[in-house]
Amino acid sequence: PKENAAGGDSFTYSAANSAGAVSLPATVTVTIEKTRSGVTYADTGEATATAAQDLAERGVFTGAKIGDKWYFEPDRTVSRGEFLAMVLETAGAEVTDVTMTGFRDDDAIPTWAKSYAAAGVAEGILRGKPTENGAVFSCEDPISFSEAATVLNRVLDLGDVELEVWFADREAVPSWAAQAVGNMEALNVLSVGSFG
């Protein structure tokens, strides 16, 4: 379709074999909707464009605008703070403005992330990294797949699977994340070997 076009179309078809048997008619309907967010990404292919657009329209993640183009940056590393914000926005968690989080590294947490950190603690999905002086959020650090699996596991809260059945690669993750990774594998959120 043309850029920024909207509308719909449909067609009906039947299939016939060499013996002359004809199938019942089937109808295919195609609907193209305009983006509600006004964001169209220059760096997403067909496979990821719809998911990226959905995140923007929900206000979960909009990427970066450079000049007059939007970039989703699918290969960019996501920080612990960014991941937590996306998860909480997607889950519809209540996020209220706060100035302090209770984490030992509170001064290093950007203002935009403090509310998400506090909400993550309140929702029971964020505990931080333990240190001898207390837990730190490490907001700007890249999130590992094991950490991401743990956060998602806590948000989804669907119960535990039998690790012997679902998790063939237990040695590849820290022990504290094994059950979460196994649970996410059982849900097809992660696949064996995709975590670190």
Each model region followed by its residue ranges:
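Alpha-helix C-terminal capping/helix-coil junction sites
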Residues: 56, 117, 121-122, 185
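Amphipathic alpha-helical interaction segments
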Residues: 19-21, 49, 111, 120, ...
